[in-house]
């Protein structure tokens, strides 16, 4: 069985790398995990995870995409597929590969060929009206994570209003309010991955892989 591939997308500074860090800290104790990060000109996110995270360096690959980060996760994902191939050859028993995109806008989505599902991260500091702006990533991602809730009172954001807007824009798709840095509700993200990606994703891989 192939490892389940989970995309982590979102604008620059929304907390993607912090989320990957927290998820790997929790999940590496029970699952065989690896990570691919996408940066335009550097491997900074990969280096952060190597330096500060819990995974061995050989389980983390940094991809330098150049140009538009959107292209590397959708139109031409060849560099990411090469990294996946590398990791699956290194580790025959991988359960999960997290693929973090470079920072992009609300229209950035992952190719369904590249990932089995993806989490899109926004943060409250982007403004209370961010959910109303829509965009495919915000409305159609498998899970929307609204991060940095602790900043809400400092940036004039009413989380109740934001919740109503998110609910309307998501049309029944799941979303979670969280504060990743303080680990608030990271457990809910883990539960979502376990129930909606590892179980359903494994079934999909078995059917198509």
UniProtKB/Swiss-Prot annotation:
An example Gene Ontology biological process: urea catabolic process
A cellular component term, taken from the record's GO annotations: cytoplasm
Residues the entry annotates as binding GTP: 10-17
Subcellular location per the Swiss-Prot or TrEMBL entry: Cytoplasm
Keyword hit for GTP-binding: yes
Main localization, broad class: cytoplasm
InterPro entries named among the record's database cross-references: CobW/HypB/UreG_nucleotide-bd, P-loop_NTPase, UreG
TM ranges: none
Origin: domain of life: Bacteria
Signal sequence coordinates: none
Keyword Lyase annotated: no
Any one Gene Ontology molecular-function term assigned to this protein's record: GTPase activity
Keywords, in A-Z order: Chaperone, Cytoplasm, GTP-binding, Nickel insertion, Nucleotide-binding
Subunit comment: Homodimer. UreD, UreF and UreG form a complex that acts as a GTP-hydrolysis-dependent molecular chaperone, activating the urease apoprotein by helping to assemble the nickel containing metallocenter of UreC. The UreE protein probably delivers the nickel.
Function: Facilitates the functional incorporation of the urease nickel metallocenter. This process requires GTP hydrolysis, probably effectuated by UreG.
Family indicated by similarity: Belongs to the SIMIBI class G3E GTPase family. UreG subfamily.
Name of the protein in question: Urease accessory protein UreG
Originating species: Lysinibacillus sphaericus (strain C3-41)
Organism lineage string: Bacteria, Bacillati, Bacillota, Bacilli, Bacillales
């Amino acid at each position: 069985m192939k490892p389940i591939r989970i995309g982590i997308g979102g604008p620059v500074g929304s907390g993607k790398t912090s989320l990957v860090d927290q998820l790997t800290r929790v999940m590496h104790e029970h699952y065989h995990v690896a990570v691919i990060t996408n940066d335009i000109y550097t491997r900074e996110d990969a280096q952060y995870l190597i330096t500060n995270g819990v995974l061995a360096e050989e389980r983390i690959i940094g991809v330098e995409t150049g140009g538009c980060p959107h292209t590397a996760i959708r139109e031409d994902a060849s560099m990411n597929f090469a990294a996946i191939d590398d990791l699956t050859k290194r580790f025959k028993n991988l359960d999960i590969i997290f693929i973090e995109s470079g920072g992009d806008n609300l229209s950035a989505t992952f190719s369904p060929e590249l990932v089995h599902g993806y989490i899109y991260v926004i943060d409250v500091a982007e403004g209370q009206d961010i959910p109303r702006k829509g965009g495919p990533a915000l409305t159609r991602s498998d899970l929307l994570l609204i991060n940095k809730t602790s900043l809400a009172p400092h940036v004039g954001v009413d989380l109740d209003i934001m919740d109503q807007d998110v609910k309307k824009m998501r049309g029944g798709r799941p979303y979670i309010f969280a504060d990743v840095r303080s680990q608030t509700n990271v457990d809910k993200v883990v539960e979502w991955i376990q129930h909606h990606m590892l179980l359903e994703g494994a079934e999909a891989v078995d059917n198509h892989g």
